[in-house]
């Protein structure tokens, strides 16, 4: 392990799979104590499997890092509050928030339901807001903190069947 992020505490949303998982693993390798946030939903947002976040946290711990799993959802303000509180309760502080949570509900817009639109917007857009807002309250008190938000090129280029994803 390196020490670039030694003694930093980082929350990574969407850390159960994909980019978020890679970010969590790299930050832990660099010395951060990591909160792996992921409710373990399928790529379309359905289901729930708390073992997804637990598995990533276990892998990080086995590799010599420090990580805990958090299965809270980012889609409610209360979930965002609980995610931030998880860092405080377990590590006494928070230094970095990385938002990578995302789902897909691909469908041509003329066939897309309002619920499919809302579900993607809730995770990508509102999910960023709920976590970042609550982190900023703490960061303001601490007088320090870093926020990293991920997006997709779909917001710039667009993909067929991903109007909701691109908008988010």
Describe each model-derived feature in a short phrase:
Residues 3-35:
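Canonical Rossmann dinucleotide-binding motif of NAD(H)/NADP(H)-dependent dehydrogenases/reductases
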Residues 50, 54, 71-82, 114:
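The beta1-alpha1 cofactor-binding region of Rossmann-like NAD(H)/NADP(H)-dependent oxidoreductases
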Residues 108-109, 116-121:
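Substrate-binding pocket helix/loop in short-chain dehydrogenase/reductase
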Residues 110, 157-166:
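Active-site loop immediately N-terminal to the catalytic Tyr-X3-Lys motif
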